[in-house]
């Protein structure tokens, strides 16, 4: 993994629960004690930029492999939570005064520990988290302006590297990507894939507070239409089959259990 720091996360999890940055062997040993379920370790990418890139295969490539592989349906920027000091108020007070962070004040205060009582200097930026997850305080905004031919080509190549146990290609999902800058992202350079979410992922740009509810629903409906089209193409080609009601129920129960941890 290239040495510490490294990332530890539950093998089955959601909303950033159980994710930690481990700085040394002692941190890893403690994580093994604290985490009762199977977990994975991965290389740490410092960013500082993180985005979610939702990629969808063109349905015709299922039967016509020579066709262009897929396209970026949506992309969202992830703004990590922070407060800005005024030289008067403590970090705790700044959190409680913040129009957004006060809704998750309990989490931020617990995370900051004793540091919550420090008074940052005027204009000093204090990070409250470094995980690109809504539930961990990150704010998602639409990043359609980041989509370029270079980035699309790079994501196509990455998606092409995935195969299931039957040798079938990857069809749809969201890559959570870290990189050094938006400029590097547009060029498709120096990307670090921190997570890949499959069919149950979503176009997380729908959570942009500056976008309307109607726009969000239109984006989701478009996503579901693509899912339906791909499923139909797989079934027609014989490379896929519908799941049974029992399988659907088991998947739902697994999801609900993961969300309740």
Where are these regions (language model features)?
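Substrate-recognition/cap regions that form aromatic- and gly/pro-loop-enriched pockets
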Residues: 165-167, 171-178
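Phosphate-binding site of ATP-dependent enzymes
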Residues: 23-146, 150, 154, 158-163, ...
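C-terminal active-site "lid" helix and adjoining low-complexity regulatory extension at the edge
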Residues: 170, 180-261
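Hydrophobic alpha-helical segments
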Residues: 158-165, 199-203
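Glycine-rich phosphate-binding loop of ATP-grasp-fold ATP-dependent ligases
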Residues: 5-28, 50-52
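A short linear hydrophobic-aromatic micro-motif
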Residues: 4-8, 38-42, 174
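A short catalytic or substrate-binding loop motif that flags glycine-/basic-rich loops and adjacent residues
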Residues: 12-13, 45-48, 169-171
């Amino acid at each position: 993994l290239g040495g510490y720091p490294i990332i530890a996360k539950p093998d089955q999890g959601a909303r950033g629960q159980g994710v930690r940055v481990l700085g040394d062997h002692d941190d890893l040993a403690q994580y093994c004690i604290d985490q009762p379920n199977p977990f994975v370790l991965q290389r740490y990418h410092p960013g500082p930029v993180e985005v979610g890139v939702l990629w969808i295969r063109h349905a015709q490539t299922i039967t016509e492999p020579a066709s262009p592989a897929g396209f970026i349906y949506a992309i969202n920027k992830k703004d990590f939570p922070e407060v800005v000091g005024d030289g008067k108020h403590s970090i705790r007070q700044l959190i409680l005064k913040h129009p957004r962070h006060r809704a998750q004040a309990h989490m931020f205060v617990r995370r900051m520990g004793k540091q919550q009582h420090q008074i940052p200097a005027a204009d000093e930026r204090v990070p409250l988290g470094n995980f690109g997850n809504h539930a961990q305080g990150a704010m998602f905004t639409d990043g359609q302006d980041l989509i370029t031919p270079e980035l699309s080509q790079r994501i196509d190549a990455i998606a092409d590297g995935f195969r299931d146990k039957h040798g079938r290609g990857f069809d749809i999902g969201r890559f959570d990507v870290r990189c050094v800058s938006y400029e590097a992202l547009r060029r498709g350079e120096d990307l670090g894939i921190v997570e890949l979410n499959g069919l149950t992922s979503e176009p997380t740009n729908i959570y942009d507070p500056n976008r309307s509810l109607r726009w969000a629903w239109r984006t989701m409906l478009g996503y579901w239409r693509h899912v339906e089209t791909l499923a139909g193409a797989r079934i027609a080609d014989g490379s896929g089959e519908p799941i049974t009601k029992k399988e659907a129920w088991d998947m739902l129960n697994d999801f609900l259990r993961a969300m309740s941890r």
